[in-house]
Protein backbone atom coordinates (compact mmCIF):
# COMPACT_ATOMS: atom_id res chain seq x y z
CA UNK A 1 0.00 0.00 0.00
CA UNK A 2 0.90 3.62 -0.19
CA UNK A 3 1.07 5.68 2.92
CA UNK A 4 -2.20 7.52 3.43
CA UNK A 5 -2.12 11.27 2.95
CA UNK A 6 -4.40 13.55 4.88
CA UNK A 7 -7.04 15.66 3.11
CA UNK A 8 -5.23 18.31 1.08
CA UNK A 9 -1.89 16.84 2.16
CA UNK A 10 1.18 15.43 0.45
CA UNK A 11 -0.73 13.20 -2.01
CA UNK A 12 -3.36 15.75 -3.09
CA UNK A 13 -1.90 16.20 -6.58
CA UNK A 14 -1.96 12.48 -7.43
CA UNK A 15 -5.14 10.97 -8.85
CA UNK A 16 -6.71 7.81 -7.48
CA UNK A 17 -5.45 6.07 -10.62
CA UNK A 18 -1.89 7.30 -10.00
CA UNK A 19 -2.02 6.01 -6.42
CA UNK A 20 -3.39 2.66 -7.58
CA UNK A 21 -0.42 2.23 -9.92
CA UNK A 22 2.07 2.78 -7.09
CA UNK A 23 0.54 0.10 -4.86
CA UNK A 24 -0.08 -2.32 -7.75
CA UNK A 25 3.43 -2.27 -9.20
CA UNK A 26 4.82 -2.75 -5.69
CA UNK A 27 2.43 -5.65 -5.00
CA UNK A 28 3.36 -7.39 -8.26
CA UNK A 29 7.04 -7.12 -7.37
CA UNK A 30 6.46 -8.27 -3.77
CA UNK A 31 4.51 -11.31 -4.98
CA UNK A 32 7.41 -12.36 -7.18
CA UNK A 33 5.34 -12.52 -10.35
CA UNK A 34 5.43 -10.73 -13.68
CA UNK A 35 2.56 -8.47 -14.83
CA UNK A 36 1.60 -10.83 -17.66
CA UNK A 37 0.77 -13.53 -15.08
CA UNK A 38 -2.19 -11.47 -13.80
CA UNK A 39 -5.41 -12.89 -15.27
CA UNK A 40 -7.90 -10.31 -13.96
CA UNK A 41 -7.78 -6.93 -12.23
CA UNK A 42 -10.44 -5.82 -9.74
CA UNK A 43 -10.13 -2.37 -8.19
CA UNK A 44 -12.46 -0.59 -5.79
CA UNK A 45 -13.10 3.14 -6.11
CA UNK A 46 -16.08 4.71 -4.37
CA UNK A 47 -15.62 8.44 -4.96
CA UNK A 48 -14.74 8.70 -8.64
CA UNK A 49 -12.65 11.86 -8.60
CA UNK A 50 -10.02 11.25 -11.29
CA UNK A 51 -10.59 12.38 -14.87
CA UNK A 52 -10.19 8.77 -16.01
CA UNK A 53 -12.29 7.27 -13.20
CA UNK A 54 -14.55 5.47 -15.67
CA UNK A 55 -11.46 3.51 -16.81
CA UNK A 56 -9.76 3.29 -13.40
CA UNK A 57 -9.16 -0.47 -13.04
CA UNK A 58 -8.21 -0.76 -16.71
CA UNK A 59 -5.72 2.11 -16.52
CA UNK A 60 -4.16 0.82 -13.30
CA UNK A 61 -3.70 -2.58 -14.95
CA UNK A 62 -2.19 -1.17 -18.15
CA UNK A 63 0.13 1.24 -16.35
CA UNK A 64 1.25 -1.62 -14.10
CA UNK A 65 2.35 -3.58 -17.17
CA UNK A 66 -0.56 -6.02 -17.35
CA UNK A 67 -1.33 -6.96 -20.99
CA UNK A 68 -4.34 -5.26 -22.57
CA UNK A 69 -6.08 -8.57 -23.30
CA UNK A 70 -6.45 -9.21 -19.56
CA UNK A 71 -9.85 -7.95 -18.24
CA UNK A 72 -10.31 -5.32 -15.54
CA UNK A 73 -13.30 -4.23 -13.45
CA UNK A 74 -13.85 -1.14 -11.29
CA UNK A 75 -16.03 -1.78 -8.23
CA UNK A 76 -18.10 0.56 -6.06
CA UNK A 77 -19.39 -0.91 -2.82
CA UNK A 78 -18.86 2.37 -0.99
CA UNK A 79 -16.54 1.94 2.02
CA UNK A 80 -16.23 -1.77 1.24
CA UNK A 81 -15.09 -1.30 -2.37
CA UNK A 82 -11.53 -2.52 -1.82
CA UNK A 83 -12.73 -5.50 0.22
CA UNK A 84 -15.22 -6.36 -2.51
CA UNK A 85 -12.41 -6.29 -5.07
CA UNK A 86 -10.55 -8.92 -3.02
CA UNK A 87 -13.74 -11.02 -2.78
CA UNK A 88 -14.28 -10.87 -6.54
CA UNK A 89 -10.67 -11.82 -7.23
CA UNK A 90 -10.95 -14.82 -4.90
CA UNK A 91 -14.19 -15.89 -6.59
CA UNK A 92 -12.52 -15.83 -10.00
CA UNK A 93 -9.82 -18.16 -8.69
CA UNK A 94 -12.31 -20.47 -6.92
CA UNK A 95 -14.38 -20.72 -10.11
CA UNK A 96 -11.33 -21.53 -12.20
CA UNK A 97 -11.61 -18.33 -14.22
CA UNK A 98 -8.21 -17.06 -13.05
CA UNK A 99 -5.03 -18.26 -11.40
CA UNK A 100 -3.83 -14.81 -10.39
CA UNK A 101 -5.92 -11.73 -9.63
CA UNK A 102 -4.75 -8.21 -8.86
CA UNK A 103 -7.17 -6.67 -6.36
CA UNK A 104 -7.25 -3.43 -4.43
CA UNK A 105 -8.83 -0.11 -3.65
CA UNK A 106 -7.86 3.51 -4.18
CA UNK A 107 -9.27 6.92 -3.31
CA UNK A 108 -8.27 10.56 -3.71
CA UNK A 109 -10.76 12.52 -1.65
CA UNK A 110 -8.57 15.60 -2.02
CA UNK A 111 -9.29 15.67 -5.76
CA UNK A 112 -13.08 15.68 -5.39
CA UNK A 113 -14.21 18.56 -7.64
CA UNK A 114 -16.85 21.23 -7.36
CA UNK A 115 -19.41 21.02 -10.14
CA UNK A 116 -22.06 23.33 -11.57
CA UNK A 117 -25.24 21.42 -12.37
CA UNK A 118 -26.97 22.57 -15.55
CA UNK A 119 -23.95 24.41 -16.97
CA UNK A 120 -23.95 22.21 -20.07
CA UNK A 121 -27.48 23.33 -20.96
CA UNK A 122 -27.08 27.07 -20.54
CA UNK A 123 -27.02 27.19 -16.76
CA UNK A 124 -24.17 29.70 -16.76
CA UNK A 125 -24.74 33.32 -17.73
CA UNK A 126 -22.85 36.55 -17.20
CA UNK A 127 -23.18 37.66 -13.60
CA UNK A 128 -24.11 35.48 -10.62
CA UNK A 129 -24.01 31.78 -11.49
CA UNK A 130 -27.51 30.52 -12.13
CA UNK A 131 -26.46 26.86 -12.11
CA UNK A 132 -26.36 24.83 -8.92
CA UNK A 133 -22.82 24.93 -7.51
CA UNK A 134 -22.14 21.62 -5.78
CA UNK A 135 -19.35 20.14 -3.66
CA UNK A 136 -19.06 16.60 -4.99
CA UNK A 137 -17.25 15.44 -1.85
CA UNK A 138 -19.83 16.78 0.58
CA UNK A 139 -22.60 15.42 -1.60
CA UNK A 140 -21.02 11.97 -1.59
CA UNK A 141 -20.84 11.96 2.20
CA UNK A 142 -24.59 12.54 2.45
CA UNK A 143 -27.18 9.89 1.57
CA UNK A 144 -29.97 11.84 -0.12
CA UNK A 145 -32.33 8.89 0.29
CA UNK A 146 -32.49 9.41 4.05
CA UNK A 147 -31.05 12.92 4.22
CA UNK A 148 -28.27 11.95 6.62
CA UNK A 149 -24.52 12.38 6.36
CA UNK A 150 -22.17 9.68 7.61
CA UNK A 151 -21.55 11.60 10.83
CA UNK A 152 -25.27 12.16 11.40
CA UNK A 153 -25.78 8.43 10.88
CA UNK A 154 -23.14 7.81 13.56
CA UNK A 155 -25.06 10.08 15.92
CA UNK A 156 -28.29 8.17 15.23
CA UNK A 157 -26.60 4.81 15.85
CA UNK A 158 -24.92 6.03 19.03
CA UNK A 159 -28.29 7.08 20.42
CA UNK A 160 -29.92 3.80 19.36
CA UNK A 161 -27.25 1.56 20.86
CA UNK A 162 -26.27 3.64 23.88
CA UNK A 163 -22.73 4.51 22.77
CA UNK A 164 -21.20 7.27 24.89
CA UNK A 165 -18.84 10.11 23.99
CA UNK A 166 -16.17 8.80 26.37
CA UNK A 167 -16.28 5.35 24.73
CA UNK A 168 -15.83 6.85 21.27
CA UNK A 169 -12.95 9.06 22.43
CA UNK A 170 -11.24 6.06 24.03
CA UNK A 171 -11.39 4.15 20.74
CA UNK A 172 -9.97 7.17 18.88
CA UNK A 173 -7.15 7.56 21.41
CA UNK A 174 -6.12 3.91 21.28
CA UNK A 175 -6.32 3.94 17.48
CA UNK A 176 -3.81 6.80 17.35
CA UNK A 177 -1.49 5.11 19.86
CA UNK A 178 -1.59 1.76 18.09
CA UNK A 179 -0.83 3.39 14.74
CA UNK A 180 2.19 5.17 16.24
CA UNK A 181 3.43 1.96 17.87
CA UNK A 182 3.05 0.06 14.60
CA UNK A 183 5.18 2.62 12.75
CA UNK A 184 7.77 2.82 15.55
CA UNK A 185 8.09 -0.98 15.67
CA UNK A 186 8.46 -1.28 11.89
CA UNK A 187 5.28 -3.32 11.49
CA UNK A 188 4.36 -1.44 8.31
CA UNK A 189 7.79 -1.77 6.68
CA UNK A 190 6.76 -4.82 4.68
CA UNK A 191 3.59 -3.27 3.27
CA UNK A 192 4.12 0.46 2.69
CA UNK A 193 5.74 1.43 -0.61
CA UNK A 194 7.25 4.80 -1.37
CA UNK A 195 5.48 7.33 -3.59
CA UNK A 196 7.69 9.60 -5.68
CA UNK A 197 6.72 13.26 -5.42
CA UNK A 198 7.96 16.38 -7.16
CA UNK A 199 8.12 19.40 -4.88
CA UNK A 200 9.59 22.88 -5.10
CA UNK A 201 12.61 21.46 -3.27
CA UNK A 202 13.04 18.67 -5.84
CA UNK A 203 12.27 14.95 -5.88
CA UNK A 204 11.20 13.28 -2.66
CA UNK A 205 9.71 9.95 -1.59
CA UNK A 206 6.56 9.95 0.51
CA UNK A 207 6.25 7.03 2.91
CA UNK A 208 4.04 7.82 5.90
CA UNK A 209 0.50 7.81 7.25
CA UNK A 210 -0.08 11.54 7.40
CA UNK A 211 -3.27 11.50 9.42
CA UNK A 212 -1.71 9.99 12.54
CA UNK A 213 -1.47 12.37 15.49
CA UNK A 214 0.63 10.55 18.11
CA UNK A 215 0.36 13.41 20.61
CA UNK A 216 -3.41 12.84 20.88
CA UNK A 217 -4.67 12.58 24.47
CA UNK A 218 -8.01 11.55 25.94
CA UNK A 219 -8.21 14.94 27.62
CA UNK A 220 -7.64 16.72 24.33
CA UNK A 221 -10.28 14.64 22.59
CA UNK A 222 -12.84 15.24 25.32
CA UNK A 223 -12.33 19.01 25.02
CA UNK A 224 -13.40 19.09 21.36
CA UNK A 225 -16.90 20.30 20.57
CA UNK A 226 -19.34 17.95 18.79
CA UNK A 227 -19.70 18.96 15.16
CA UNK A 228 -23.27 17.97 14.30
CA UNK A 229 -25.22 18.03 17.59
CA UNK A 230 -24.74 20.12 20.72
CA UNK A 231 -24.97 17.00 22.86
CA UNK A 232 -23.50 14.69 20.21
CA UNK A 233 -20.35 12.61 20.13
CA UNK A 234 -18.84 13.06 16.65
CA UNK A 235 -15.89 15.47 16.72
CA UNK A 236 -12.92 16.28 14.50
CA UNK A 237 -10.85 14.08 16.82
CA UNK A 238 -12.85 10.86 16.79
CA UNK A 239 -14.38 10.85 13.31
CA UNK A 240 -12.78 8.97 10.42
CA UNK A 241 -10.44 11.26 8.54
CA UNK A 242 -10.66 12.14 4.87
CA UNK A 243 -7.60 11.26 2.87
CA UNK A 244 -5.83 9.77 -0.12
CA UNK A 245 -4.17 6.40 -0.69
CA UNK A 246 -4.24 2.99 -2.30
CA UNK A 247 -3.72 -0.66 -1.36
CA UNK A 248 -3.27 -3.75 -3.54
CA UNK A 249 -3.21 -7.50 -2.86
CA UNK A 250 -2.26 -10.23 -5.33
What are the language-model segments listed below?
Residues 76-107, 152, 158-187, 248-250:
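Active-site-proximal alpha-helical scaffold in enzymes
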Residues 100-156:
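Flexible glycine-/small-residue-enriched beta->alpha junction loops
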Residues 4-6, 53, 83-87, 109-112:
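Short glycine/serine/threonine-rich phosphate/pyrophosphate-binding segments
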Residues 36-44, 71-76, 101-105, 167-174, ...:
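Beta-strand segments within the central parallel beta-sheet cores of soluble alpha/beta enzyme folds
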Amino acid sequence: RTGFGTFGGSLKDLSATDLGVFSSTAAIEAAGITPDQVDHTFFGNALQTSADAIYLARHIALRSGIPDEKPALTINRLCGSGFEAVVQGAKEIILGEADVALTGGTESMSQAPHVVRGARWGGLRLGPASGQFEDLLWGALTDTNCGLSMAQTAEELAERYGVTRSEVDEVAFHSQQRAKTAWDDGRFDIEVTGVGLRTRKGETTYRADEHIRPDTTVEGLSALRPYFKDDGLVTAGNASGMGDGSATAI
